[in-house]
């Protein structure tokens, strides 16, 4: 015992020296990578500024954006051993998106996403593997499948709107729209992706596991039982297993010659027709991509639908024109579905939807990792291993006419600012990893705007800071969009 204490005492100076050397080198390497870019002069050892990020994400990223104004559109920081660069300038963001390749950048979607989502996630693929999966996925978002999805989307949306009408349309008490819309989106995603293979128990399992997973995207990356991140990672594994069962049932159904009725059916229908099956078409591999879709559609759509309600309530003239556009094709009393052709003809509502996505892009940033040193500007080379955060939000307020104004007409056929400033409209990304489901997402937003605005009058409950942005994990209004709802229908549809 005495010898152990003596040994420890003799080693203590060396251990302390090694620790001090490590801390000194950590600061030195940070300063060397930082060079003359704006950012903290010194960072907290090991964890960096992750506590500030977890405590108040909005404030953290606002400060990074403000610092980037003082340079070439870049600022830096340090998070749990990772040097990060925030990219505010739209052209530099385009440069990152256009260089996803083995010797430049890899999309990570989340600073610790690979550990959270798993190796088979489409997010982390590039090269031939990524092209192979995209070739399988892309046909599932063409006109015929989208038309089938639209019918399913409307059934779910209308069912939830009727429930809201029964519960809240008296207008006697306000309701926070966030949870209502979140539940609507989760059921819509489940129904469109794997609907025929879900019973009530499986739906509840997916909902519960997703609710465990979601907080993990905003937690410290401690992968241990009882910690939010660790529980989230295990929830992803359970979601993949659940989706794998649906994929297997779909393959059996398509092999029997039945017609596809949901996304996984359209996908497996083409797979069973090939012999041998294409690469990356195993049950687990397909289910991993379906979980990616679930994450993308759930939180991103919740954000966009919430902001649609917020912005329509604050813009009465826009809301009036939306209702006029809907009335040309559809009425809740008609008990008819909106057809694919009618959906395409709702041009003003589509402009409103696109402006919602520009004004408040659901994912404010899309993290990438530098696979090797990359010369971003004439004066700065991004070091290998750096996590870069191109800001879609900041890009949306560059170039456009009066960018701080909510103006759907900028997307009209006359002005076409989406084409004129397409390098600034990055909500769905660009390049090889551009969102494959963007037409589906836009249709979902258009359908919700059309149906919700036709069925309800809504009045926002104003409070201090209600319009402030919070990241949970996508951008949402701070108050969850609290409104009074009242039915516009004489009788229930």
Swiss-Prot record:
Subcellular location, principal: membrane
Topology relative to the membrane: Single-pass membrane protein
Keywords, in A-Z order: Heme, Iron, Lipid biosynthesis, Lipid metabolism, Membrane, Metal-binding, Monooxygenase, NADP, Oxidoreductase, Steroid biosynthesis, Steroid metabolism, Sterol biosynthesis, Sterol metabolism, Transmembrane, Transmembrane helix
GO MF annotation list: C-22 sterol desaturase (NADPH) activity; heme binding; iron ion binding; monooxygenase activity
InterPro entries: Cyt_P450 (IPR001128), Cyt_P450_CS (IPR017972), Cyt_P450_E_grp-I (IPR002401), Cyt_P450_sf (IPR036396)
Tissue: Expressed in stems. Detected in primary root caps and immature petals.
Reaction catalysis annotation: 5-dehydroepisterol + NADPH + O2 + H(+) = ergosta-5,7,22,24(28)-tetraen-3beta-ol + NADP(+) + 2 H2O
GO terms, biological process: sterol biosynthetic process
Keyword Kinase: no
Enzyme Commission designation: 1.14.19.41
Residues annotated as binding heme: 435
TM segment ranges: 5-25
Cellular component terms (Gene Ontology): membrane
Family according to the record: Belongs to the cytochrome P450 family.
The protein, known as: Cytochrome P450 710A3
Native species: Arabidopsis thaliana
């Amino acid at each position: 015992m005495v010898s152990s204490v003596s040994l420890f005492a003799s080693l203590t100076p060396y251990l302390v020296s090694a620790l001090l050397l490590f801390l000194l080198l950590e600061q030195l390497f940070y300063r060397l990578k930082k060079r003359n870019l704006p950012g903290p002069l010194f960072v907290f050892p090991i964890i960096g500024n992750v506590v500030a990020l977890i405590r108040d994400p909005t404030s953290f990223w606002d400060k990074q954006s403000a610092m980037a104004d003082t340079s070439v559109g870049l600022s830096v920081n340090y998070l749990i051993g990772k040097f990060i660069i925030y990219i505010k300038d739209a052209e530099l963001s385009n440069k990152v998106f256009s260089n996803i390749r083995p010797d430049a950048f890899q999309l990570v979607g989340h600073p610790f996403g690979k550990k959270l989502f798993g190796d088979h996630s489409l997010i982390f693929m590039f090269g031939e593997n990524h092209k192979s999966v995209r070739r399988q996925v892309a046909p599932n978002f063409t006109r015929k499948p989208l038309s089938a999805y639209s019918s399913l989307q409307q059934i779910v949306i209308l069912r939830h709107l009727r429930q809201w009408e029964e519960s809240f349309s008296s207008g006697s008490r306000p309701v926070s729209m966030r949870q209502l819309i979140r539940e609507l989106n989760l059921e819509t995603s489940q129904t469109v992706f794997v609907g025929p293979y879900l019973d009530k128990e499986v739906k509840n399992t997916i909902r519960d596991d997703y609710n465990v997973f979601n907080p993990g995207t905003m937690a410290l990356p401690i992968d241990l039982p009882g910690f939010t991140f660790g529980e989230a990672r295990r929830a992803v594994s359970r979601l993949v297993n659940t989706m794998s069962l649906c994929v297997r049932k779909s393959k059996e159904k398509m092999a029997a010659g039945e017609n596809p009725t949901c996304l996984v059916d359209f996908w497996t229908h083409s797979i069973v027709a090939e012999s041998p099956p294409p690469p990356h078409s195993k049950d687990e591999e397909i289910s991993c991509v379906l979980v990616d879709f679930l994450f993308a559609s759930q939180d991103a759509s919740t954000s966009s639908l919430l902001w649609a309600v917020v912005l329509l309530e604050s813009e009465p003239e826009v809301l009036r024109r939306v209702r006029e556009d809907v009335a040309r094709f559809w009425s809740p009393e008609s008990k008819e579905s909106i057809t694919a052709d009618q959906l395409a003809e709702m041009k003003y509502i589509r402009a409103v939807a696109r402006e919602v996505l520009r004004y408040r892009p659901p994912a404010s940033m899309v993290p990438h990792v530098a696979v090797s040193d990359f010369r971003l500007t004439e004066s700065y080379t991004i070091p290998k291993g750096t996590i870069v955060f191109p800001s879609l939000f900041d890009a949306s307020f560059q170039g456009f006419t009066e960018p701080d104004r909510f103006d759907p007409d900028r997307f009209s056929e006359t002005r076409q600012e989406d084409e004129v400033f397409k390098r600034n409209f990055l909500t769905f990304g660009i390049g090889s990893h551009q969102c494959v489901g963007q037409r589906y997402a836009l249709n979902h937003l258009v359908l919700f705007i059309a149906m919700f605005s036709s069925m309800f009058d809504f009045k926002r409950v104003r409070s201090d800071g209600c319009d402030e942005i919070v990241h949970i994990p996508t951008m949402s209004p701070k108050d969850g969009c609290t409104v009074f709802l009242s039915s516009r229908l004489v009788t229930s549809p």
